[in-house]
């Protein structure tokens, strides 16, 4: 009997005949199916086998009698059908009817193949006996291979068929529908099968293959059908957990976790796009609109993926060490989509909150369960972690969230986060406190804007929004309050490191937390910290940012010391010792108890008197000015204290008067140390302005007028403005008004032309203070001569905004400021890290010219200094009121002459 005759005959048989001829005919059909090269015949035979003979096979014969022999050929033929479509698709058009019919025939054949496989699944599901995987082993692998190819073809169809999709669209739709039904049936079938704990190696390998194959399908169908995508993920997770003890060490956990992360990110982005469309269409309130229902459906998917990820990580955490960096990145990416992140899209608040609850609540639960997992902590606390600027704030908020959870963690997790890496062989990681300060420092733009965050509960009521600084500070202090004492050392090291870095606001945050630690701890701890900072201050180079930051901490902590410890501190760091002046110059007397304050005032005045006398007795040498400036800094401390006694005021006025008599504009302009002296004298004079004699005020104003304002450092200008503003408090005597008042007007005019907007703001403030209380109104009129100056002052006093800045423009400006601030901090820290003397290179020839130029610049600078000093000395001698110079002056000049001769001789020899 020929093949055609057999097929025609079998197609006429009823079910009873098929059952009777099963053992004879089925092997022949399988052989025919294997040997045929005709797609049509292949499909016809497969339909006959699955519809007429498969129902009569016993459960034990399904695999050997049908599936293992027939299904491998199905996979090959299905792949060849897809390959043929790819070859012929280029010629498809509405005019080429022959090719159109050919391709439609192939697609129909593919649909029929899927129908046959669905028939196999339905039959196995209908069997009442308990089905084992060995009974159907070839069926899942065949179906999953065909499904993967089918879904991939459907996914690529829009590009593959391009504008000709309408010619085959109905068949593609039917193909997808049949594949959808087939996968659903297969998952139902596999769900009925139960593996025993004694499952064979082969069976375990099979179920792992099924899970991985479904994962591959998940990656394909993510944008094709939401329901199928979700159901496939449910099945993957369910099967993974169902057979956890068998498959947990064989699953590709990294692939599964990465795929879940990508699907969650994609779903959140889809939700936000829908929310933006709703906002643009003005449908925020239309809760029954199709758009809003679509948004709710998308939000449901987000919640599903987030909860699925939480469930998966909970069950397989120990196998997810390689995925921790992706989980960390996911947390940052998701949080960057919501306020207060500056890159969060603009969406209606109600929709944003709905999505936030759906996603961030599960993400927080995931963070909680990952807290004790060391690879996750290492990823979050990695010192070398690099991320884009938009993730700086999410990283900071993540760390703040971690601190809030530490109190509920076991000791091992607490040590993991709070202590940092302890040994070289460990993966480097910061302590969470150090990481918070580092991430806060990076949030420059967020601090400039500033972003606002919800406040904590206070007396049963929620605070309003707070700044990032306050948010971080409150949560860090709350963490410190419950931190066991054995974890204080890494906290203290982190606080000190944050104080010693260049960003001032980060140092201020560390200072706030440090003060809380000092108040929360014992008095002895506070005293110990103050002594430590005092020693660090003594070791700091003058004028550095570290000195400024340490001084900030010292001032704050002195307030918190007990009176007994304050007195001990005064005794431990007496002002009679030169090295202690740098400690006291940065304190505030009002923070001290009465006994300590009186001691400091007495020591400062005694020391100042001694230093001034020694300076005058030595001939007012320029080299002694730095020593004089150090004690003047401390004198300013006394002046700034409240309730200064009359005796102190008299002593201070005497010191100030003597020093003003020695200041000459020509010298001040040249010497930086004298500029510092004048700055201090101006600040002192501003406070004691009502106690100064008129001729001293004249000397101060004249000295200030003689300076070239545009060449003075900013701190000197600010002190000058403070002094000028204080002049409004006094009445200038008539005999010197003609000399003083015009100079005041001229100085204000000069300051008002400063290009720096920051200095200009201080100038306007100072002029406003002066104008508000002065009796000399002619100074005001003389200052406001030009319309430009008058306009600046009036706009400032009336608080007129010159131009309104859009939010976009402001944000761009702040981004530019951010770059400037970061560059400035990096520059300061790089200067600090450079050695004092750069070692010579072995081959300096390439840079020889630059070294010579630098030497010439140094010669020029020092010669100018020497010339200025000699001219100033000459001016003193030529003065009419100057007495004859003492004998030691002539001797010193003779020594200088000898030194000049020696320098000339050396220069001639070298040339």
Curated annotation (Swiss-Prot):
GO annotation terms (biological process): interstrand cross-link repair; mitotic cell cycle
Pfam family, one: DUF4487
Renumbered residue ranges of the record's region Disordered: 830-853
Cellular component, GO annotation: chromosome, centromeric region; cytoplasm; kinetochore; midbody; nucleus; spindle midzone
Keywords assigned: Centromere, Chromosome, Cytoplasm, Cytoskeleton, Kinetochore, Nucleus
GO molecular function terms listed in the Swiss-Prot or TrEMBL record: protein kinase binding
Bias type Basic and acidic residues, positions: 844-853
Keyword Lyase: no
Location within or outside the cell: Chromosome, Centromere, Kinetochore; Nucleus; Chromosome, Centromere; Midbody
PANTHER family per the UniProt record, alphabetical: CHROMOSOME 1 OPEN READING FRAME 112, FIGNL1-INTERACTING REGULATOR OF RECOMBINATION AND MITOSIS
Primary role: May play a role in chromosome segregation.
Protein name per its UniProtKB record: FIGNL1-interacting regulator of recombination and mitosis
Gene for this chain: firrm
């Amino acid at each position: 009997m020929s093949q055609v005759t057999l097929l025609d005959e079998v197609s006429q048989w009823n079910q009873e005949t098929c059952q009777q001829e099963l053992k004879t005919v089925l092997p022949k059909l399988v052989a025919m199916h294997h040997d045929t090269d005709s797609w049509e015949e292949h499909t016809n035979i497969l339909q006959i086998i699955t519809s007429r003979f498969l129902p009569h096979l016993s459960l034990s014969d399904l695999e050997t009698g049908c599936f293992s022999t027939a299904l491998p050929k199905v996979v090959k033929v299905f792949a060849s059908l897809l390959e043929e479509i790819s070859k012929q698709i280029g010629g498809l058009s509405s005019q080429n009817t022959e090719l159109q019919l050919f391709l439609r025939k192939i697609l129909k054949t593919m649909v029929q193949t899927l129908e046959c496989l669905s028939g196999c699944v339905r039959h196995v599901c209908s069997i009442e006996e308990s089905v084992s995987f060995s009974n159907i082993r070839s069926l899942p692998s065949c179906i999953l291979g065909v499904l993967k190819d089918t879904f991939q073809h459907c996914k690529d169809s829009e590009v593959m068929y391009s504008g000709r999709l309408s010619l085959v669209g109905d068949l593609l739709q039917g193909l997808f529908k049949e594949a959808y039904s087939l996968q659903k049936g297969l998952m139902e079938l596999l769900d009925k099968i139960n593996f025993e704990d004694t499952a064979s190696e082969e069976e375990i390998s099979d179920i792992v293959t099924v899970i991985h194959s479904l994962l591959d399908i998940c990656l394909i169908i993510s944008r094709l059908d939401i329901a199928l995508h979700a159901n496939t993920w449910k099945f993957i997770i369910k099967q993974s957990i169902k057979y956890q003890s068998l498959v947990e060490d064989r699953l590709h956990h990294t692939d599964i976790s990465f795929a879940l992360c990508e699907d969650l990110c994609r779903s959140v982005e889809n939700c936000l796009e829908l929310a933006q469309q709703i906002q643009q269409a003005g449908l925020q309130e239309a809760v029954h609109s199709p758009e809003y229902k679509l948004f709710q459906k998308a939000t449901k998917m987000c919640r599903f993926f987030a909860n699925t990820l939480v469930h998966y990580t909970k069950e397989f955490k120990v196998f997810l060490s390689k995925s921790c960096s992706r989980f960390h990145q996911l947390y940052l990416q998701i949080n960057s989509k919501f306020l207060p992140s500056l890159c969060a899209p603009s969406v209606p608040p109600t929709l944003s909150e709905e999505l936030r609850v759906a996603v961030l609540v599960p993400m927080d639960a995931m963070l909680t369960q990952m807290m004790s997992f060391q690879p996750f902590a290492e990823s979050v606390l990695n010192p070398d972690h690099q991320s884009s600027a938009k993730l700086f704030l999410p990283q900071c908020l993540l760390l703040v969230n971690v601190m809030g959870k530490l109190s509920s963690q076991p000791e091992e997790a607490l040590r993991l986060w709070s202590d940092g890496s302890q040994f070289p062989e460990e993966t480097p990681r910061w302590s969470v406190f150090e990481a918070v300060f580092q991430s806060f420092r990076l949030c420059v733009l967020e601090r400039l804007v500033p972003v606002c965050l919800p406040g904590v509960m206070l007396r049963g009521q929620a605070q309003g929004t707070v700044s990032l600084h306050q948010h971080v500070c409150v949560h860090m202090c709350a963490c410190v309050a419950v931190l066991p004492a054995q974890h204080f050392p890494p906290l203290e090291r982190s606080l000190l490191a944050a104080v010693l870095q260049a960003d001032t606001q980060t140092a201020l945050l560390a200072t706030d937390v440090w003060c809380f630690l000092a108040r929360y701890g014992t008095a002895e701890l506070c005293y110990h910290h103050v002594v430590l900072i005092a020693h660090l201050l003594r070791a700091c180079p003058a004028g550095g940012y570290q000195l400024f930051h340490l001084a900030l901490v010292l001032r704050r902590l002195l307030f918190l010391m007990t009176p007994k410890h304050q007195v001990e501190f005064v005794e431990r760091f007496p002002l009679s010792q030169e090295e202690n002046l740098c400690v006291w110059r940065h304190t505030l007397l009002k923070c001290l108890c009465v006994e300590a304050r009186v001691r400091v005032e007495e020591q400062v005045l005694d020391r100042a008197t001694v230093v001034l006398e020694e300076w005058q007795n030595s001939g007012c040498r320029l080299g002694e000015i730095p020593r004089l400036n150090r004690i003047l800094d401390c004198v300013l401390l006394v002046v700034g204290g409240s309730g200064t006694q009359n005796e102190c005021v008299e002593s201070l006025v005497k010191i100030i008067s003597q020093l003003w008599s020695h200041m000459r504009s020509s010298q001040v302009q040249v010497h930086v140390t004298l500029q510092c002296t004048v700055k201090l004298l101006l600040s002192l004079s501003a406070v004691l302005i009502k106690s100064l004699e008129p001729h001293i005020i004249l000397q101060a104003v004249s000295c200030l007028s003689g300076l070239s304002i545009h060449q003075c450092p900013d701190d000197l200008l600010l002190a000058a403005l403070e002094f000028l503003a204080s002049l409004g408090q006094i009445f200038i005597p008539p005999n010197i008004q003609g000399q003083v008042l015009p100079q005041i007007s001229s100085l204000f005019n000069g300051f008002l032309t400063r290009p720096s907007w920051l200095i200009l703001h201080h100038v306007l403030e100072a002029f406003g203070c002066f104008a508000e209380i002065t009796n000399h109104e002619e100074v005001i009129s003389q200052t406001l001569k030009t319309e430009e100056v008058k306009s600046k002052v009036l706009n400032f006093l009336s608080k007129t905004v010159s131009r309104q800045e859009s939010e976009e423009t402001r944000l761009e400006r702040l981004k530019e400021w951010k770059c400037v601030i970061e560059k400035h901090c990096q520059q300061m820290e790089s200067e600090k890290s450079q050695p004092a003397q750069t070692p010579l290179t072995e081959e300096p020839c390439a840079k020889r010219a630059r070294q010579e130029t630098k030497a010439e610049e140094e010669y020029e600078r020092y010669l100018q200094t020497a010339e200025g000093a000699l001219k100033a000395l000459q001016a003193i001698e030529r003065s009419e009121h100057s007495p004859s110079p003492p004998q030691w002056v002539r001797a010193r000049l003779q020594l200088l002459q000898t030194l000049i001769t020696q320098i000339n001789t050396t220069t001639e020899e070298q040339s």
